[in-house]
């Protein structure tokens, strides 16, 4: 009961704004109820340590703006090889007076083509080449003990074409086809191409890729193996939020950039 009251007290500060924005965008009460339920369940699952951190951050909302904040950005594999080895570098990070560590994408990705980790196959699982979710949790806990907050890139725009949603879409599942921007012919894609710039015009020209399995054009703003998500679909918003909440339970205090 105490945990429920804590959540409701914290949520009350943002509830009206969240509900107004969600309904303005989606006009979907059922989706809103699912989102709020997921948020409550995630809060209840948070450890006492994380809830104490929540309270401290709420009492000092400007903590990250202080002049003594010093951050570093790195790819885990290039700096240390994997998450376990990165944890062994903690003395060096402390020596640098680090307070904020930003790790580039490390969630499960296809190999070898993954756009530096920005093509994500599973938003809830660390890439096996870098370690496990437990390794990430242990690293984050040790960083916090050292006064270092961990930040991860969370790739919200797209999934890998090998993500389970994309695979289900290719197999003809209409529910998951609605997770992406799909077109039967070039009418709308050609209208896009008239005004939308290309991110990689030399190596990945165009913003759409033909999917032979579906016989449809897929919006792929970056590479052909990165399928843009359709945020006009409330289920996409809710599912992506669930993955952010999942990361927050692995002791990550700042899961997104």
Model-assigned labels for residue ranges:
Residues 1-238, 245:
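Acidic/aromatic-lined carbohydrate-recognition and catalytic surfaces
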Residues 248-256:
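Residue-level detector of conserved catalytic or cofactor/ligand-binding positions
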């Amino acid at each position: 009961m105490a945990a429920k009251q804590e959540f409701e007290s914290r949520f009350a500060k943002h509830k009206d704004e969240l509900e107004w924005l969600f309904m303005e965008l989606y006009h979907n009460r059922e989706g809103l109820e699912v989102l709020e339920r997921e948020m409550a369940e995630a809060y209840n699952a948070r450890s006492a340590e994380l809830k104490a951190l929540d309270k401290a951050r709420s009492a000092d909302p400007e903590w990250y703006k202080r002049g003594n904040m010093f951050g570093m950005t790195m790819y885990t594999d290039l700096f240390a090889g994997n998450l376990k080895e990165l944890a062994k570098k903690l003395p060096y990070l402390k020596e640098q007076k680090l307070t904020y560590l930003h790790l580039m994408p490390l969630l499960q990705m296809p190999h070898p083509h993954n756009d530096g980790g920005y093509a994500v196959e599973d938003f809830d699982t660390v890439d096996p080449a870098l370690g496990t979710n437990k390794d990430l949790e242990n690293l984050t806990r040790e960083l916090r003990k050292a006064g270092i907050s961990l930040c991860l890139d969370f790739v919200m725009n797209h999934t890998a074409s090998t993500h389970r949603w994309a695979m289900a879409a290719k197999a003809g599942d209409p529910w998951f086809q609605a997770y992406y921007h799909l077109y039967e012919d070039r009418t709308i894609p050609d209208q896009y191409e008239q005004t939308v710039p290309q991110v990689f015009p030399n190596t990945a020209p165009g913003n759409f890729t033909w999917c032979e399995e579906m016989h449809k054009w897929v919006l792929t703003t970056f590479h052909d193996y990165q399928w843009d998500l359709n945020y006009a679909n409330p289920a996409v918003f809710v599912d992506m939020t669930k993955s952010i909440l999942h990361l927050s339970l692995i002791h990550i205090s700042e899961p997104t950039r």
